[in-house]
């Protein structure tokens, strides 16, 4: 989670509210509030915490205002029961009473019925004002769908300039999944798992793993760039399984795939697709794939897939778990990426990651056609990881990254990050040793930012041990040799 993501989600929520799409705005506002709550746990400065709490309250107030608008609109819809369709084209005149309109608005006030031809100049002026005002002011539509182009005669008689503006608005609108027939709460729960339209993680942000990057580009990225080539027998792969020890960068690779493909990115885990109510877990799986097809091209990243799709037929397996696995297998086989008559640019790619590939069901292993190994970083990769982690720190002249990389052989990417974090705190620990809390608060900022020395890294390497054993590496290599598909 980053401040950039929070900022973009706030902009998206406000844009939805301005366009009258209040239900989508509420979903975005709720997501932002949860993101800020999580971010508050990482903030240590009390002054920053107070500022973020104030931001949370302001955004929560905006959310409450949008909810109040929705309740007002719903009350109007319940109270208005016309016996026949309104005489005008859009029926706008019969929705809002005269006293509601206190200022200039894209909606006309209630007037006595007059023939349409007599009010032609007036309606044209109002339609132009409506198109402009709904981008600058908070709209007050009856059903939250004010951004649609005008209908009927008004659409034909509008000025060409207004038609161009409306076309631009419709292109910028974000399409929304119509979950008719499904529980609204289930759809909103899955919408919160859409990380971003663009996770903004590039290949260069990931150290080493050149072979894995090459395979993922061929399996996922190239079909988006060369749709005419990847047809027939060359159709894109249905799914990719990334296998490897913990902390080797499998999640980062998934985000890089979504960024390079410009796809919608679903981050799914076992908690997303499980429910205490009978039958809802299977519905969640089906809704997930229907939403993925709607927002295609889409990348569905299922982390720790072994927790959902372990082997079937074992004594520990529950009936509910078996039904979820069956639905997931059916939906994955139905996605199919792109066949002879389908557009590869509208594919749905299932990207999975696991630390226990030997526990995965055989049918799922067959559907994940590409199975690649994400190993521990090499010596060159460890040096690159050190440079990425230490780019914001001031280092002493005696720091030798090549030597640190040599001493950290067998460490995963997460282990190397922990070593760098621990070493960066060494100077601060030495500075505050033996001081009282009052003296610590009075230390200047310049004194706290001391250079990190080679001795700090050597001490951290002694304190931080490897998280992956040699026996585990042998198991991964044996499995990938038997079932790998690189």
Swiss-Prot record:
One Pfam family this sequence matches: AAA
Matches recorded under SMART domains: AAA
Gene giving rise to this polypeptide: katna1
Subunit composition and interactions: Can homooligomerize into hexameric rings, which may be promoted by interaction with microtubules. Interacts with katnb1, which may serve as a targeting subunit.
Regulation of protein activity: ATPase activity is stimulated by microtubules, which promote homooligomerization. ATP-dependent microtubule severing is stimulated by interaction with katnb1.
Function: Catalytic subunit of a complex which severs microtubules in an ATP-dependent manner. Microtubule severing may promote rapid reorganization of cellular microtubule arrays and the release of microtubules from the centrosome following nucleation.
EC number: 5.6.1.1
Location of the protein in the cell: Cytoplasm; Cytoplasm, Cytoskeleton, Microtubule organizing center, Centrosome; Cytoplasm, Cytoskeleton, Spindle pole; Cytoplasm, Cytoskeleton, Spindle
Classification of source organism: Eukaryota, Metazoa, Chordata, Craniata, Vertebrata
Protein name (Swiss-Prot/TrEMBL): Katanin p60 ATPase-containing subunit A1
Assigned protein family: Belongs to the AAA ATPase family. Katanin p60 subunit A1 subfamily.
């Amino acid at each position: 989670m980053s401040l950039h993501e929070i900022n973009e989600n706030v902009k998206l929520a406000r844009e939805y509210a301005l366009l009258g799409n209040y239900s989508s705005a509420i979903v975005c506002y709720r997501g932002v509030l949860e993101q800020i709550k999580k971010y508050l746990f990482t903030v240590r400065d009390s002054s920053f915490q107070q500022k973020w709490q104030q931001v949370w309250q302001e955004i929560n107030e905006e959310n409450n205002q949008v909810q109040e608008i929705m309740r007002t609109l719903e009350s109007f819809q319940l109270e208005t029961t016309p016996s026949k369709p309104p005489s005008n084209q859009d029926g706008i005149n019969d929705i809002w009473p005269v006293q509601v309109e206190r200022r200039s608005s894209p909606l006309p006030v209630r007037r006595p019925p007059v023939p349409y031809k007599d009010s032609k100049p007036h309606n044209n002026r109002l339609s132009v004002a409506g198109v402009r005002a709904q981008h600058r002011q908070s709209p007050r539509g009856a059903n939250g769908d004010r951004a649609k182009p005008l209908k009927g005669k008004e659409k034909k008689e509008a000025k060409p300039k207004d038609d161009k503006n409306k076309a631009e608005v419709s292109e910028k609108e974000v399409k929304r999944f119509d979950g008719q027939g499904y529980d609204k709460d289930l759809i909103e729960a899955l919408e919160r798992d859409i990380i971003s339209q663009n996770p903004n993680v590039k290949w260069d942000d990931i150290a080493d793993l050149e072979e894995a990057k090459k395979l993922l580009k061929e399996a996922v990225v190239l079909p988006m760039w060369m749709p005419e080539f990847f047809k027939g027998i060359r159709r894109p792969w249905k799914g990719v399984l990334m296998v490897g020890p913990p902390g080797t960068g499998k999640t980062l690779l998934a985000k890089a795939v979504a960024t390079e493909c410009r796809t919608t990115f679903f981050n799914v885990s076992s908690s997303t697709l499980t429910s205490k109510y009978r039958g809802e877990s299977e519905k969640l799986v089906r809704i997930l794939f229907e939403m993925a097809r709607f927002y295609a091209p889409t990348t569905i990243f299922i982390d720790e897939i072994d927790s959902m799709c372990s082997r079937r037929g074992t004594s520990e397996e529950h009936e509910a778990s078996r039904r979820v696995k069956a639905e997931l297998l059916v939906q994955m086989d139905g996605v199919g990426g792109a066949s002879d008559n389908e557009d590869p640019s509208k594919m749905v790619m299932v990207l999975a990651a696991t630390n226990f590939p030997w526990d995965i069901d055989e049918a799922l292993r067959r559907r994940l056609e590409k199975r690649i190994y994400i190993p521990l970083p090499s010596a060159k990769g460890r040096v690159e990881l050190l440079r990425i982690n230490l780019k914001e720190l001031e280092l002493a002249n005696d720091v030798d990254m090549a030597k640190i990389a040599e001493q950290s052989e067998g460490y995963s990417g997460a282990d190397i990050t922990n070593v760098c974090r621990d070493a960066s705190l060494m100077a601060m620990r030495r500075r505050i040793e033996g001081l009282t809390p009052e003296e610590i608060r009075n230390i200047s900022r310049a004194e706290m930012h001391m250079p990190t020395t080679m001795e700090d890294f050597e001490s951290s390497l002694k304190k931080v041990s490897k998280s992956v054993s040699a026996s585990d590496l042998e198991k991964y290599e044996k499995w990938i040799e038997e079932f790998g598909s690189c």
